[in-house]
Amino acid sequence: MDRYFLSPSGDGRDMSSAIEEKLKEHGVCILGAGAYYVSTVKMPDGSSLSGMGNATSVILMDSVSSGAAIELGSYCSVRNMHVTGTDKKTDVPDTLGDRHGIRFMGDATDFNREKIQPKSSMIEGCLITSFSGGGITLMDTGYAIDSSIVASNCQIMRCGAGINIFRFSEYHSFTNINCTDNLYGCINNGGNNLFSSCHFSSNKTGFLIDNRNGQSNNNSHGSVVGCTFNHSDKNKGIGIEVLGARHGFVFSSCQLFFSKIVVENSYGIVFSDFNCGKAEEITVKGGGLVSFRNFNFSKEPKISVSDNEKVETINFSLR
């Protein structure tokens, strides 16, 4: 095991090359307890990087204005560590930036659908904090089912977006991800992405789909199941915001307390089996079919609909 193990330098120098050398030589690198400062760890295909839980901190150096602490290749895994943008105390960013935690990146566009992109990778059991961009960022990863990641059992805090999915990025799966105290809990601008048992609570905005300018022909058409969207922007913000989604999206078996739903110029958006608390507002503007089914409220919600004759509200009840 010793040959796979790497200790921290203890002097704050860039450990990126040392980590990459272990990964290239053995396919595995195990980081011990302590702080590992990096400019970017570029993981070779098929490699695995793991730590000792929150005792291991991979820290993106302050000198890096744009980039990621860890860049995934194909068939990579990152497990059991704290990945952070600084060793200093930080607040939630005011704007979305370019410093990311763990990034899976290709170069897909609307026009190169056949080009091979990076393949399946995994993220598990990580605490990710203090990045101006995404804690987990998926950038132009393409349209193939195996050009995707599976992420589970992570906590993401004080980032521009807990999860940041760019356009032309599909088939990613997230389970038991707690995105809290971020500017956005999740920005999901790709398609066919799945979220289950995740928390998008106590962010400025909980969950955003934004295709309002038609930037991507392949947007939305995914699902969110069993997730929470509570206490957005100090109980006055938007829990779910869907803008310009053209191909449908399903939110099912979710909880929404002290947060709003906003849907604009979108089609085939389904909200079903929601438990709602106080201060909820639902706003729909333009677009086509938007369906709200089996909603339970603690008090009568405020519902506003304009320029849309296809909004359904089925089985609304007060407890």
Regions of interest found by a model, annotated:
Residues 35, 142, 169, 213:
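Active-site-proximal loop/turn and secondary-structure-junction residues that shape catalytic pockets
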Residues 1-7, 315-319:
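Glycine-rich, low-complexity segments
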Residues 52-55, 74-85, 115-130, 145-160, ...:
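Right-handed parallel beta-helix
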Residues 17-23, 36-45, 49, 70-71, ...:
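Short, T/G/N/S-enriched strand-turn elements that build extracellular solenoid repeat scaffolds
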Residues 3-30, 37:
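Acidic Gly/Asp/Thr-rich repetitive segments characteristic of extracellular carbohydrate-active
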Residues 20, 24, 36-50, 58-118, ...:
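Extracellular beta-strand-rich solenoid/capping regions of secreted or surface-exposed proteins
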